[in-house]
Amino acid sequence: MKQALRVAFGFLILWASVLHAEVRIVIDSGVDSGRPIGVVPFQWAGPGAAPEDIGGIVAADLRNSGKFNPLDRARLPQQPGSAQEVQPSAWSALGIDAVVVGQVTPNPDGSYNVAYQLVDTGGAPGTVLAQNSYKVNKQWLRYAGHTASDEVFEKLTGIKGAFRTRIAYVVQTNGGQFPYELRVSDYDGYNQFVVHRSPQPLMSPAWSPDGSKLAYVTFESGRSALVIQTLANGAVRQVASFPRHNGAPAFSPDGSKLAFALSKTGSLNLYVMDLASGQIRQVTDGRSNNTEPTWFPDSQNLAFTSDQAGRPQVYKVNINGGAPQRITWEGSQNQDADVSSDGKFMVMVSSNGGQQHIAKQDLATGGVQVLSSTFLDETPSLAPNGTMVIYSSSQGMGSVLNLVSTDGRFKARLPATDGQVKFPAWSPYL
């Protein structure tokens, strides 16, 4: 917990720009198919009202994962304050085999102790599957709740939780001197802040693998440019500003390289920069357009979009040489892929029969599953644990963010109140 707090501390310097017009998750479908679980309001040991509803945060996280269906508070058979107070029969009668209880205690120095216990209702009374406690300041209470959620999620599913992650996205506001904003928020839309404001369009944010930097495209110089911004201090490094197009940045998983697309020689082609030396080398060549690179876990291979066969399709290429190999064959066109961190599958924008949706492709079998059902879906980005996808879609005259689970069952929206939202990018583990 302490190490995670140190990593996240770099964001505090930007909290002066925290916005009130935040996005929030609105669930559309799929939660009913999740595993039932009980999450009891955490017991508050201080005067007055608790400063944060930690139990509510844990319940929302588990619900937002699409894998759990927390029992509504009005239906809780009891509200135990500790593992010893849980009555297994009361919960098992409702089909619930796991219950989360917890406590929040204020300390004399102004900090808080947050503790939780995950109780097995199928075992002897008081059987604890997992437990932990954290000492945090007030501004880190939500983070402590997300930490508890991560641990509960991993214990029950075997999958690392991703509730302490963030999302970056571009908002086009309604007028003003700087109508384009690059923003970052917690994965659930809370604690939103502005990274950069611009009078000209901003595009394609991409996270560094340690979560400390964002690469993105800006047009503030009068033409497109690729920059990398350090979140802790706002420092900006210009990576590329060649004639014509500079776009689609993607950090390698090992953090040593940045892939992007340039059209300085005419057609769009892929290039890779060694971030330590600044040396750039060309990866693809030819008269076709090659863009939207995404890395495989080995930091040596890229998936990318190319129209070399006529319509856009996804190809794979080794950055050290060799001919690209086409890897998508279903649908009239496929583009803008994002490869999972384990390299087993990718998500992409797939078009067929006049529809444009987010699809998942198994990279071993080639099997494709359409995940989304929204309109004109774009720019999918995977959560680091591979369980969820965030993407943008058209709604009315604007664009919004959406979530869909990689099994296609759970669907949700993150509506914004102050502009169109595009180019979402899910952070690595923080």
From Swiss-Prot:
Keyword Translocase carried by entry: no
Any GO BP: cell division
Keyword Aminoacyl-tRNA synthetase belongs to the record: no
Pfam families for the chain: PD40, TolB_N
GO CC terms of this entry: periplasmic space
Localisation: Periplasm
InterPro entries per the UniProt record, alphabetical: 6-blade_b-propeller_TolB-like, PD40, Tol-Pal_TolB, TolB_N
Keyword terms of this UniProt record: Cell cycle, Cell division, Periplasm, Signal
Signal peptide as annotated in the record: 1-21
Similarity comment text for this entry: Belongs to the TolB family.
Function, as annotated: Part of the Tol-Pal system, which plays a role in outer membrane invagination during cell division and is important for maintaining outer membrane integrity. TolB occupies a key intermediary position in the Tol-Pal system because it communicates directly with both membrane-embedded components, Pal in the outer membrane and TolA in the inner membrane.
Assembly: The Tol-Pal system is composed of five core proteins: the inner membrane proteins TolA, TolQ and TolR, the periplasmic protein TolB and the outer membrane protein Pal. They form a network linking the inner and outer membranes and the peptidoglycan layer.
NCBIfam families per record: propeller_TolB
Protein name: Tol-Pal system protein TolB
Organism: Shigella boydii serotype 18 (strain CDC 3083-94 / BS512)
Upper lineage: Bacteria, Pseudomonadati, Pseudomonadota, Gammaproteobacteria, Enterobacterales
Record gene name: tolB
